[in-house]
């Protein structure tokens, strides 16, 4: 839910910037710095651990008690441990 709200806000922000740039008659938008700051928000969401059957490249990509299976395509699976 949090991700969908952030995506919606990002889309609305980009639409606002596009329409305001058109109204000013400007061909150059001053939004690349703003878009790069939004990129950081989405990277923080993507850096969360991967759940069961999520794609992975190393064991550290997967959540606790999951490990990366190396079959193609790679995916997170239970590593046989239990929570204490």
Swiss-Prot record:
Signal peptide: 1-21
Chief location of this protein within or outside the cell: secreted
GO cellular component terms given for this protein: extracellular region
Protein's organism: Chilobrachys guangxiensis
GO MF entry, a single one: toxin activity
One Pfam family recorded for the sequence: Toxin_12
Name of the protein in question: U2-theraphotoxin-Cg1b 2
Location in the cell: Secreted
Entry text on domains: The presence of a 'disulfide through disulfide knot' structurally defines this protein as a knottin.
Tissue: Expressed by the venom gland.
Cystine pairings recorded for this chain: 49-63, 56-68, 62-76
Described function: Probable ion channel inhibitor.
Ion transport as UniProt keyword: no
Propeptide segments, given as residue ranges: 22-48
Keywords: Disulfide bond, Ion channel impairing toxin, Knottin, Secreted, Signal, Toxin
Family: Belongs to the neurotoxin 10 (Hwtx-1) family. 06 (F4b) subfamily.
InterPro entries to which the protein is assigned, alphabetical: Huwentoxin-1
TM segment ranges: none
């Amino acid at each position: 839910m949090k991700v969908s709200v952030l995506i919606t806000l990002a889309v609305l922000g980009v639409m606002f910037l596009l329409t305001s740039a058109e109204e000013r008659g400007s061909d150059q938008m001053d939004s690349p710095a703003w878009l790069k700051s939004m990129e950081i928000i989405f990277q923080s969401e993507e850096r969360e651990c991967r759940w069961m059957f999520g794609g992975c490249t190393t064991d550290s990509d997967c959540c606790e008690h999951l490990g990366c299976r190396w079959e193609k395509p790679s995916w997170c699976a239970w590593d046989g441990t239990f929570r204490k």
